[in-house]
Curated annotation (Swiss-Prot):
Its cofactor is Ca(2+). Binds 2 calcium ions per subunit. Ca(2+) 1 binds at N278, E356, Q357, D358. This is Neuronal pentraxin-2. Ca(2+) 2 binds at E356, D358, Q368. Disulfide bonds join C254-C314. Keywords: Calcium, Disulfide bond, Glycoprotein, Lectin, Metal-binding, Secreted, Signal. The keyword Chaperone does not apply. The gene is Nptx2. Residues 224-425 form the Pentraxin (PTX) domain.
Length: 432
């Protein structure tokens, strides 16, 4: 205190001397300094003291100036929050229009930006909910900061009440928006569930109708006088042979087929066993030639049946040296060996018509599907003689397979595939 008084006296004396002896052309410049600079080395003149403290008027004036700046800052913050709420309200109105199904066309395209809400109503609601929750958190943080500042600086009660009331109004508006969004989200969920249930009911009705049609076509003139129709290249239309194969050391497979696809007829049949999906497969994929796969080993067959006409094909194979033969319309077009030699065909697998299996009984690929009609699919456990194959192909004899015969009650169809009465053998010959 003594030092301050001494400094004040010295300052007063210097000022008096300056007045008595002014320096020509000189002037005094007053510059405002921050409190830190004053404390560091520029002491200010002592303010009038009364009992060692500021007067009530000066204390109130300082508090009012401080909180006037605080109120200006809070107004700016509240203005920014008001703009954010206005923007979110606008987006909510757009969301409500979208929920009614009339705001947008199904063919529109766009990106999910702040000006272009996502197409999925659920995503819209979730995005707005997150935005409102963020705004609420910011308001709560602002309110907490306000309480802290008020407790530290002694904010006048009228200012505190005004700000508290304004924050309360904003919070209530925010809670109302959140409640509206929750109701909207629940409504959209209910509408989506109802639409999904309606779709499932429609699909079930169609499936039941297809099943009725399939059953209605089961009365054929004879058990083998039918064909399996696979009209589309999909991964769900197929036929399934109920019986499975025993262990085989030789076989002959014959069938009639008429392909509706080009290039590549797809997969007329496939046989898969656990551990080997390509135990026996006949496939023509893309522009590749027809291939016979046995135990995933490949032989290319010189067969050409993708002209949309009925064709009779037979394939023989024996484990001895892997010998194979390929017949088309009764004529032997190719032969070879070393196709999975000394490998017996494994028993207990699944035999599928029209699809290539990647796992036993499933994982079909639409690009490898057969499109067209199949009939008279028979399997024998031996290599048929060439004359026997000719007689079957020219309708001279009816010779069912002794392992897999072509009969109605041994073939199931799925996914929209169907069974229909087949043309007579003579009619198929005329189509060649």
């Amino acid at each position: 205190m003594l030092a301050l008084l001494t400094a004040g006296v010295a300052l007063a004396v210097a000022a008096g001397q300056a007045q008595d002896n002014p320096i020509p052309g000189s002037r005094f410049v007053c510059t405002a300094l921050p409190p830190e600079a004053a404390r560091a080395g520029c002491p200010l003149p002592a303010m009038p003291m009364q009992g060692g403290a500021l007067s009530p008027e000066e204390e109130l004036r300082a508090a009012v100036l401080h909180w006037r700046e605080t109120v200006v800052q809070q107004k700016e913050t509240l203005g920014a929050q008001r703009e954010a709420i206005r923007e979110l309200t606008s987006k909510l109105a757009r969301c409500e229009g979208l929920a009614g199904g009339k705001a947008r066309g199904t063919g529109a395209t766009g990106k999910d930006t702040m000006g272009d809400l996502p197409r999925d109503p659920g995503h819209v609601v979730e995005q707005l909910s997150r935005s409102l929750q963020t705004l609420k958190d910011r308001l709560e943080s602002l309110e907490l900061q306000l309480h802290t500042n008020a407790s530290n600086a002694g904010l006048p009660s009228d200012f505190r009440e005004v700000l508290q009331r304004r924050l309360g109004e904003l919070e209530r508006q925010l809670l109302r928006k959140v409640a509206e969004l929750e109701d909207e989200k629940s409504l959209l969920h209910n509408e989506t569930s109802a639409h999904r249930q309606k779709t499932e009911n429609t699909l079930n009705a169609l499936l039941q109708r297809v099943t009725e049609l399939e059953r209605g076509n089961s009365a054929f003139k004879s058990p083998d006088a039918f064909k399996v129709s696979l009209p589309l290249r999909t991964n769900y239309l197929y036929g399934k042979i109920k019986k499975t194969l025993p262990e085989l050391y030789a076989f002959t497979i014959c069938l009639w087929l008429r392909s509706s696809a080009s290039p590549g007829i797809g997969t007329p049949f496939s046989y898969a066993v656990p551990g080997q999906a390509n135990e026996i497969v006949l496939i023509e994929w893309g522009n590749n030639p027809i291939e016979l796969l046995i135990n995933d080993k490949v032989a290319q067959l010189p067969l050409f049946v993708s002209d949309g006409k009925w064709h009779h094909i037979c394939i023989t194979w024996t484990t001895r040296d892997g010998m194979w033969e390929a017949f088309q319309d009764g004529e032997k077009l190719g032969t070879g060996e070393n196709l999975a030699p000394w490998h017996p065909i494994k028993p207990g697998g699944v035999l599928i018509l029209g699809q290539e299996q990647d796992t036993v009984g499933g994982r079909f690929d639409a690009t490898q599907a057969f499109v067209g009609e199949l009939s008279q699919f028979n399997i024998w456990d031996r290599v048929l003689r060439a004359q026997e194959i000719i007689n079957i192909a020219n309708c001279s004899t009816n010779m069912p397979g002794n392992i897999i015969p072509w009969v109605d009650n041994n073939v199931d169809v799925f996914g929209g595939a169907s069974k229909w009465p087949v043309e007579t053998c003579e009619e198929r010959l005329l189509d060649l």
